[in-house]
Amino acid sequence: MSRTVPIEKQRNIGIMAHIDAGKTTTTERILYYTGVSHKIGETHDGASTMDWMEQEQERGITITSAATTCFWDGYRINIIDTPGHVDFTIEVERSLRVLDGAVAVFDAVAGVEPQSETVWRQANRYGVPRVCFVNKMDRIGANFFRCVDMIQERLRAKPVCLQLPIGAEDNFEGIIDLIHGVSLKFDKETKGLEVERGPIPPELMELYQEKRLEMMEAAAEEDEVLLAKYLEGTELTAEEIIACIRKATIEQRLVPVLCGSAFRNIGVQPLLDAVVQYLPSPLDIPQMVGHNPNSPEEEIVCHCSDKEPLAGLVFKLASDPFIGHLSFFRIYSGFVESGMTVLNTTTEKRERIGRLLKMHANKREDIKWAGAGDIVALVGLKQASTGDTLCDEKRPVILESLDIPEPVIEVAIEPKTKTDRDALSTGLNKLAKEDPSFRVKGNEETGQTLIAGMGELHLEIIVDRLLREFNVNANVGKPQVAYRETITKPGKSDTKYAKQSGGRGQYGHCVIEIEPNPGNGYTFINSISGGVIPKEYIPAIDKGIQDALKSGILAGFPVVDIKVNLVFGSYHEVDSSEQAFYVAGSMAIKDAMHKSNPILLEPIMDVEVVTPDDYLGDVMGDLNGRRGKVQSMEARSGAQAIRAQVPLSEMFGYATELRSRTQGRATFSMQFDHYERVPAAIAEEVIKSRS
């Protein structure tokens, strides 16, 4: 099938920012001006096109990254609207992985906010070129130049202003185009559809000349031929400036900065112009390199062409109430069409594509064919998960998957009624398949189901979705820490189990010695000699001991790191049995532990906190208050990375606490490191709570 839009006229972009910077409103205006939406949806009315889940419309925030397609000036633009809340980092992560460029939206009052820094770092990691849009210029306290300075200082970027605001706050009425030397004013009556071009206001002429000079210098520095021309005093043409800034933007040496107010319909069309002028097409970015699954050392370059064999990445799964499973798919080479069979190299299974959809938020359009560089939704895949590679069977290739962050918070969840139990299990498994940063696991010791995610809001939304989509009522509690028990000194037990109650009795007798076995788990040594216990009964003693160790004598937690030596015993020719020796073994280990000074152990987490220097003292003090032991510190571009070991029991609620202490500017990750003795006072409380 032939293309309607050539690849060089395609843009795959994300709209990213801190929560409340106005990303979704900006996207709404883009859809309005490109003719997709005939009525503007407002986020604060809960009528936004892109925020299509009920929870999003209620909370006025974007949770899942909705994908939509629009056209501007002969270009096709695929837009992914991403959430700005730190709990939904995975949505941003998986969007950036498949995008070619991004629009970073900033609040003109707040400037560079914490999540802006996080998202910017993610975009750096994936090498995504950006343009910046300083939004909300009509707000009280809006300051365009302060925002530009923050982009330079906090994000370590090299911003180049392509526009200047005309007025600010209530008096914000338009923008100056520094490249073409004109003012642009947006007609209120037509909701900004009509744009009036005019001369530069006299009071801004001096500032315009100064900033235009800065812009031309920044552009010329990126190109030797232009620099020579500029230094000779020759005026650079608009085409030369645009070409130069485009090249530097794609190579991530410059970041063009524009301004406006999406809510007031000011500056959105020039932003669209900037998207097609400065952000890359799929042909302008480095070609995707994968590996041969049958020979991992062999690299395979997936050239962006419809004529190449198919290779692409499933970057998101979603459930549609009318269609079922949707798999969002970025095509890096080749093409897909409905009815086609593809190879999933991650699962090593073949899959048939049912339908192909172009998405517009939660509306959809059936298409028959999609080519290299496109983003589409596939229907009918049964095996695919987020991060899977789909390709042509004749050229198997595996692409780099997504970087899935480890969950940082977990809570216990249980169905309110027995009838909810099966539905809870189904719902949790479905949600975990859609969202790889959400995990479900059973705790065998407590019998609880634990759900883990990126933060409290993340898990709140999950519980909310269980109720709305799966009709499951669930109670959510505080999880229990998985403590362990062990011994600190050797002990001995001589235990006889004898039972006579008419007929055949029960008889088992064993003598065991136990000692601490740090770091080596459970070890069983059989030192019986001379047949005092027949060898067929030895495994029963071992099994009885191991089963008894599943529930320790202090608080019923599993016992670890213990060495057991079976040294002596006796048996009865008639009454002895495997069952009798099983019971004798379990009784002996309990008795021996009482004599071996048992203690509680708790999980210690390896925690890394990255915080701006301003909050270092506060963060350190808080970690010390949580019984944390700081292991190391290192400077990281305007921030400090603290490595500490902290008991898991002290880490509940830490995500929220850290966010409030640092205005959300610090991030942390943690993973299990080892078990350590619980201080006596705390152990006493834990034991008391279990009795």
Curated annotation (Swiss-Prot):
PROSITE patterns: G_TR_1 (PS00301), G_TR_2 (PS51722). GO terms for molecular function: GTP binding; GTPase activity; translation elongation factor activity. SMART domains: EFG_C (SM00838), EFG_IV (SM00889). Its main location: cytoplasm. It holds the Pfam family EFG_C. CDD domains: EF-G, EFG_III, EFG_mtEFG1_IV, EFG_mtEFG_C, EFG_mtEFG_II. It is found in: Cytoplasm. Residues 8-283 form the tr-type G domain. Coiled coil: none annotated. NCBIfam families: EF-G, PRK12740.1-3, PRK12740.1-5, small_GTP. Belongs to the TRAFAC class translation factor GTPase superfamily. Classic translation factor GTPase family. EF-G/EF-2 subfamily. This is Elongation factor G. It comes from Lawsonia intracellularis (strain PHE/MN1-00). The lineage of its organism: Bacteria, Pseudomonadati, Thermodesulfobacteriota, Desulfovibrionia, Desulfovibrionales.
